[in-house]
Amino acid sequence: MNGNYSAPTEVGRWQQRALIIGVVFTLLFAMGAFLDRSQFFHSYLVAYLFWTGIALGSLAILLLQHLTGGAWGLIIRRVLEAATRTIPLMAVLFIPIILGAHQIYPWTHHDEMSKTPALEEKARLYLNLPFFSGRAALYFAIWILTAYLMNKWSREQDRIADRRFTKLMRMISGPGLLLLVLTVTFASVDWAMSLNPDWFSTIYGLLFVIAWALSALAFVIAVMSFLTNREPMSRIVRPNHFQDLGKLMLAFVMLWAYFAFSQFLIVWSGNLPEEIQWYLPRLRGGWGAIAVAVVFFHFAFPFLLLLSASLKRNARKLVMLAGLIILMRFVDLFWMIAPEFSPEGFHVNWMDVVAPIAMGGLWLAVFAWQLSKRPLIPINDPQYDSVLAQAPAPAHADH
């Protein structure tokens, strides 16, 4: 080994605190199931999609990094790998969605799907609980297998300095990324778009793909800022590493805005009743103010700030912006999902706040546990020497 790259002891304390928060808020959230069963599952779905997005977005960025061979990915690879190893947890946490499908999805109600021949055909061929559950099982099988192979070969590369593992990871990254995009697209249709079985959008799935990748990248930047203040990453990470991550975050912010605006423009220009029905409740009754906030704080504000090279090189400032993006990712997701349950106007229930904290505590505890299990740097990677050759300057030095 070329040095001690074990995770700092603070990661263990982080795990304990996250677990305590997760357990306490899970117990509080569980009480909500007895008070309002429907609201419980509505809040659960939003929280689930948010944290699953970070796990799957991390897998997407991990595959992208291996595919492109970018040196920017060496310092964040172990953070990404740890996040992908939480996917089995999300598979288990999907079970309540199946159990509560009748409270979540209108297509589980026969009277709803018998209104038109088109809806009856959808229910017969696609929107039915057995097929819905089977597709979810297939998605998770693909995601877990892909994450398992990437982590297995990375672990073997730590043990044996063999370039064969680098080639294997690159070989699977192309098909794996394509398969991930396809499965996430279908999953977003199943889990989110089918909340309104009358409505469809060909851009909706891609919007989820980009949004989840953006969530994951912002989360990675937050974790890297935490690790950079401590050994061993304090002597490895340089301002240019954060600049590379900032550039990538700017690209994802722009891509998200492009797809979101494209979908809105197509629906607005078509002005067809079956298409505008999705946007109408989201632009009225208080939801419109949320939409404006998303435009400004999810796109305009981050876009303008990320144009600054000095901000991207400053870890303190960049992590604050990453935190804002993580918050706005949840707000945007809530804006996309919640109006289906309260189309009459903006409404926030206490379970909408408790659910993401409960699930987030459990997810972060598993993430921290996985992060502490392996060295923070893949020491036998072919790019190791070139990336770490220069003596680093403190990542927070630039202002």
Question: Which sequence ranges carry the predicted segments?
Answer:
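N-terminal regions that are enriched for targeting/export leaders
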Residues: 1-55, 124, 386, 391-399
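Long, contiguous internal "core" modules enriched in hydrophobic/ aromatic residues
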Residues: 9-31, 124-294, 311, 381-384, ...
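TerminUS-proximal long segments
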Residues: 10, 14, 115-117, 297-302, ...
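Juxtamembrane "helix-exit" motif on the non-cytosolic side of transmembrane helices
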Residues: 31-39, 190-197, 334-342
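Non-cytosolic membrane-interface motifs at loop->transmembrane helix junctions
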Residues: 41-49, 76-78, 196-209, 280, ...
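Transmembrane-helix bundle segments that line or gate the permeation/cavity pathway
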Residues: 49-159, 173-176
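Hydrophobic cores of alpha-helical transmembrane segments in multi-pass inner/ER membrane proteins
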Residues: 55-63, 91-96, 136-148, 210-225, ...
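Hydrophobic alpha-helical membrane-insertion segments
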Residues: 85-102, 251-260, 321-328
